[in-house]
């Protein structure tokens, strides 16, 4: 039976989670809340997407609801999560994709309106974090709020796990060359907390902070304190790439490491999550790719048997949203068994 889901926040991730839910098949989005978009604009924003193209199915308004492919979706415009009537719409699970309510306490406000569980589509300071293919076995049905971590952590963690399981990571540094996101400025503008982040997104390569590498230590405890990293924001609309440099305990040639990753990508745990390519790829080749991470065999290099650079691509919108759907589906299945 399909999982009944509500989406709070109909921005980039909210809309692409909905597109993925339609493809996913066992997720039924029954409600959307966004106080900043009216229903007509919601239809337009969902149908037309500069990055992922025009939605090919039917999108219309009927009886005050958003109707996609004939399925009605209740639309709310509440600013306070506690006031959203998820229960009345039949939504058991809420995808919290505003980027605002990312703590356990704030996300739990959704429960007041009748939701049973909340999945935050962002890293959280205190909610348990899960990465598909890495630590789903640690999920406990008693959790009411969970985080799907970040798009970059979803790219890095499966790759890091394979390397750590086979060669033991001593320490490492990650750089993500990251596509522009909605929080950036089209031209120079005020950004008090991050001065460089306020510079025009289309005109600059912008160094930025990211907690993605440190967060790997939360989903793989044996890597805690062994990884950190930074980001460069670049003027592309979508698709990012992780550059991971690690020192490994068990020496291996780059060819051996490639073969290990290739084999791991074909296992049931990582199939479709960690992909492998030998092709001469560039970023746009991954637009709309649903994998969390695609290892670029031609992109990496090793200095010696213990020091290696690994490169892995990810569609930071589409791939991440696919994992949000997978996580919702997984926890619903576990909850049903509890």
Curated annotation (Swiss-Prot):
Site annotated as Activates thiol group during catalysis: where?
Answer: 178
Kindly list the residue ranges recorded as spanning the membrane: none
Binding site residues for D-glyceraldehyde 3-phosphate: 150-152, 181, 210-211, 233
One molecular function GO term is: glyceraldehyde-3-phosphate dehydrogenase (NAD+) (phosphorylating) activity
Mention any one GO cellular component term assigned to this protein in its UniProt record: cytosol
Tell me which domain of life the UniProt entry assigns to the organism this sequence originates from: Eukaryota
Q: InterPro entries under this entry?
A: GlycerAld/Erythrose_P_DH (IPR020831), GlycerAld_3-P_DH_AS (IPR020830), GlycerAld_3-P_DH_cat (IPR020829), GlycerAld_3-P_DH_NAD(P)-bd (IPR020828), Glyceraldehyde-3-P_DH_1 (IPR006424), NAD(P)-bd_dom_sf (IPR036291)
Family annotation (PROSITE patterns): GAPDH
In terms of Pfam families, this protein maps to: Gp_dh_C, Gp_dh_N
Q: Describe its assembly.
A: Homotetramer.
Q: What is this protein called?
A: Glyceraldehyde-3-phosphate dehydrogenase
Question: Organism, per UniProt?
Answer: Phaffia rhodozyma
